Amino acid sequence: MRSEEEIKTAYAQINSLYKDAVNGDEKAVQALHQTLEQVRSNHANIPLLNAYHGSIMILIARDKTNPLEKLRWSKAGLKLLDDAVIFSPQNFMIRLLRGKAAHKLPEKHFNRGHTAIDDYTFLIKSHERGKGFLNSKAYWQLIYELGEVYYRMGRNQDAGICWRKLKNETQDPAFQRLLLSKLKLVEGKPAVETRTEPEGPFASLLRRIVNEAQNQIPDNSQQTT
């Protein structure tokens, strides 16, 4: 297959399967991983393909049950996403892929809340300047999730600003109720606080593995399942 056709086929498969992969279809995740691993072996310097592969690795980590495997795949995916942003920092889709991945990762184990904030803020401000590709629903979703990240990091004032902005813009009754419930979480709270969450057995095990293995994990950006 010629290079142009191989790349075009990869993007077509991404368009076909990526949403299913995000929604929990493990077969779609594995199909995209195999395709992207193959095309990247021939075209290693396409930032958007690297970012998609990094995002898929985060989904592979999601589906793993072994904590160390979760950590390995998450680390590999984040490396590809970070490198893609370094090479193409103004690419809206790359920033969206990395921001969404960072938003989903547990803050206490990965400390990537700042990454989600950087990427989401870039996308939101770009949209407000008339740039980018977000529709109104996606724009509101990013502001809502940005508020969630701020809240998880103990930045109550910033979280409240995000949720109040949405409350003033939306007319949807269900969304209004959700935002009111979120605003109650930060009502009367200090602007910034240290937030701790109860740690269950699985989280405790993952924390120990992270602490013990973080500096010993090789770069698995070419790893297969």
What are these language model-derived features?
Residues I58-A61, D82, M93, R98-W140:
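Alpha-helical adaptor scaffolds
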Residues A21-L36, K70-K79, R112-K125:
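Helix-turn-helix repeat elements of alpha-solenoid scaffolds
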Residues M1-R40, P47:
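N-terminal leader/linker segments that initiate helical-solenoid repeat arrays
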Residues K19-V22, G54, L59-L68, K104-F110, ...:
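Short coil/turn linking the two alpha-helices of tandem helical-hairpin repeats
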Residues F133, K137-L142, V149-T225:
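Terminal, low-structured helical/coil segments at or just beyond the last alpha-helical repeat
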Residues S3, E37-N50, D82-N91, I124-S136, ...:
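Flexible helix-coil transition and linker loops at the boundaries of alpha-helical arrays
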